[in-house]
Amino acid sequence: MPAATAAPSGARIATYNRVMPDPERPASFRDLTVAAFVDELASGAPVPGGGSASAVAASLGAALVAMVAALSQGRMRWAEHAELHAESAATGRELAARLLDLADEDAEAYSAFAAARKLPRETESEQAARRAAMQAAARWASDVPMATLEACLSVVSAAESLAGRCNANAASDIGVAALLGEAAAHGAAANVLVNLPSVGDDAYAAEMTMRVKRIVDDIQQLAATAHETLGQGESREPLRT
């Protein structure tokens, strides 16, 4: 599972609470109701935005993985896949929690970049400090959606593993998990790529661009396999170990 991304040192970080300083608002998106999060997303505030929305969508996909695995546990018909179901249930829950954290981190990273842009730039030293802060924040704003993208790969991979090896009554649910993971991946990829030009590091940008393409390709292949399996009904070859 992707490691936590670190905030850039030296940058003036404007956190989610500073962007939206209402003391009645919770410090984390996970503490909002679904309706409240949707309202925040629809508001004119800069956060949450597409990056946070992508992470939340992927979190829902991960939760569906956990749900389908749980619905499949203890069923004699699927007993040969009991280990897969146990692992998938745990993995789905872990990914769902991690992706909610990434939704918060995405808002914080954007806020850091917005704060850096507002730094003074009257003197050469101020301009240099502002540029360095913006580049550090842009790197952070690229690293966070990259972590989301990697988590999306884990979500879709888990969904693909369960397709055809789970409770048949939940087949559509695992299909939705794959769809959410794939859609969220495209959103995360877009957020990585849009921030790379502001990092000021061509080698880093090239490496990240290649990683994005590779991961998105892998996700699309896994999702296609999952949907093909689900479209063929309940039959599937057992896992190879």
Functional labels for PLM-detected ranges:
Residues M1-V19:
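N-terminal amphipathic/basic-hydrophobic helices that include classical n-h-c signal peptides
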Residues F29-P48, N167-A168:
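Short, hydrophobic/aliphatic alpha-helical segments
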Residues S43-A66, A170-A188:
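Conserved phosphate/anionic-ligand binding catalytic regions in large, soluble enzymes, centered on
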Residues M76-L119, I215:
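A structural-propensity feature for long, helix-poor, extended segments
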Residues A151, V155-A158, N169-P238:
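Preference for long, well-ordered alpha-helical segments
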